[in-house]
Amino acid sequence: MNPAPNLILIGPMGAGKTCIGRRLAERFTLDFVDVDQAIVDAAGASIPTIFEHSGEAGFRSHEREALARVLEGRGQLVSTGGGAVLDPGNRALIAQRGFVVYLRVSVNAQLERLARDKGRPLLQRPDREQVLHDLAAHRDPLYRELADITLDTDPYTAADATAHLVVKLATQWQRQDLTP
C-alpha cells in the first residue's frame, strides 16, 4: 500500500483524466480539482488566451503556481494538464503529494477523441497526428517515471476505466475511504 494525501491523474490530452477523474472522485468522495480549470480561474483567461498572450512558457508558469496551490490540499482527486510533468519541480511535487495514476492512450485514440476539440493550443496545426506522436515520445517516459499505476484507456469507456481503477486503487492506495 502506498499512502498519499491525494490521488493524481497524469497522462496526455484525450486520455480521459477529467472524465474518469470526476467519476473516481465521486466514487471515493474526494474533491475533484482540474488543474487546467484552476489556471483559468486564477488567470481570469482561457488557456488558448493565455497561450496567445504569454506563450507556452507563460502558461507553464501559471501551471506551476496552480499545481503548487492545489497540492497544498489533501483528500483530492487532481487532474493535471498533459504537460504538467515537463517541469522537474512539478514532477517532484506530484510524487510527494499524491498517488499517481498514469492514464495512457494511443495517438489513434487521441485523434478520435479530440477530433472536434478546438481548445487545445498545441493542436492548432494541420499536422495534429505528428504533434501527438512528438508529445508522446517526449512525455511518456516522464509519465512512466511518476506512475504508481498505469491504465491503458483505449479499450474502455469512462465507466469501465473507472471500474478497473476502483479495484486497483482499493488494493494499492492506502486510504480508509477506498474500500470497494
UniProtKB/Swiss-Prot annotation:
Pathway: Metabolic intermediate biosynthesis; chorismate biosynthesis; chorismate from D-erythrose 4-phosphate and phosphoenolpyruvate: step 5/7. It catalyses: shikimate + ATP = 3-phosphoshikimate + ADP + H(+). Transmembrane segments: none annotated. SUPFAM superfamilies: P-loop containing nucleoside triphosphate hydrolases. Pfam families: SKI (PF01202). The keyword Nucleotide-binding applies. Binds 1 Mg(2+) ion per subunit. InterPro entries: P-loop_NTPase, Shikimate/glucono_kinase, Shikimate_kinase/TSH1, Shikimate_kinase_CS. Keywords: Amino-acid biosynthesis, Aromatic amino acid biosynthesis, ATP-binding, Cytoplasm, Kinase, Magnesium, Metal-binding, Nucleotide-binding, Transferase. The keyword ATP-binding applies. It comes from the Bacteria. Signal peptide: none annotated. Mg(2+) binds at residue 18. It is found in: Cytoplasm. One of its GO terms (cellular component) is cytosol. ATP binds at residues 14-19, 120. Monomer. Catalyzes the specific phosphorylation of the 3-hydroxyl group of shikimic acid using ATP as a cosubstrate. This is Shikimate kinase.
